[in-house]
Structure formats: C-alpha cells, structure tokens
C-alpha cells in the first residue's frame, strides 16, 4: 500500500518532471524562431520626362533562425500612394534575374494588386544570413507634368 507521503511525492514529482522536460525543449524551440532585419536599404529614384518615377531598391536582409524561402514588398498605390500604380516590375538577386510567375518556385516573383497597395512576392532557395535583392519598377502618374 502507498503511504500519504508517497502520494504527495507523486503529485509533486510528475509536474516537476513535465516542467523540466518542457524547459529543456524551450531553447531548441527558441533557436528555430525566424527573424530578419534590414542591414541596408538603398533607393534610387529617377524622374522621367512624362512624370513617371523609375525606382530601383536594393535591400540587404539578414535572415536568422529557421531558413526563409520568400519575402514580400508592399507599395501603396492609387489614392493611398498618390500615384496611378506601378508597372515594369523586376526582381533579382545579384546576377540571378527572377521570372514573373505565380508558381511560388524559387527564382520567381509575382505582382499582386491588393486595392490600395501592390504587393511583390518573391521566392528563393532557403536562406540564412545576409542576402541582397534588387527591385526595379515604374511608379506611374507620380508627378503631374504640364506647361507653364
């Protein structure tokens, strides 16, 4: 038969063992937390004679934790962006030019109209550490052109 101290010991021991087991797994779970930050973000804007803006963004991101396989860039358009939208989108990583496709395959990107913003989703091989991506696009109707 069990004594009263055996029963109390089991009630304390089981939760203690579960707590220690979960506490031991926590560092592994934290190590897999996906985070990123920009280490550099350069933007080159050239005003075209027709009032459009030719934009080139070069973004260096530092991925940590579990590998990343996609990213996105949202650009306000219409009234929210005070423009007529974007066009001529291209994405590259170094010399690799991404292909426009909705396949979500590495090396592709898609342009998605979401009303007040246009979202550029781009897909790449699993990435950790620093990676640099270049986005080029035209902002239509950014500047009103007229004669005086």
Segments predicted by a language model, with ranges:
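Lumenal/extracellular ectodomains and adaptor appendage modules
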Residues: 27-148
């Amino acid at each position: 038969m069990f004594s009263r101290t055996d029963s109390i010991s089991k009630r304390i021991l089981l939760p203690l063992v579960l707590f220690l087991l979960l506490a031991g797994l926590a560092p592994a779970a934290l190590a897999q937390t996906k985070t990123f930050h920009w280490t550099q973000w350069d933007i080159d804007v050239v005003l075209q004679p027709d009032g459009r803006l030719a934009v080139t963004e070069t973004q260096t991101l530092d991925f940590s934790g579990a590998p990343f396989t996609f990213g996105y860039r949202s650009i306000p358009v219409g009234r929210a962006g005070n423009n007529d939208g974007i066009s001529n989108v291209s994405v590259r990583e170094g010399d690799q030019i991404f292909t426009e496709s909705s396949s979500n395959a590495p090396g592709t990107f898609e342009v998605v109209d979401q009303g007040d913003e246009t979202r550029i989703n781009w897909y790449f091989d699993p990435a950790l550490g620093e990676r640099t991506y270049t986005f080029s696009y035209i902002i239509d109707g950014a500047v009103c052109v007229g004669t005086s």
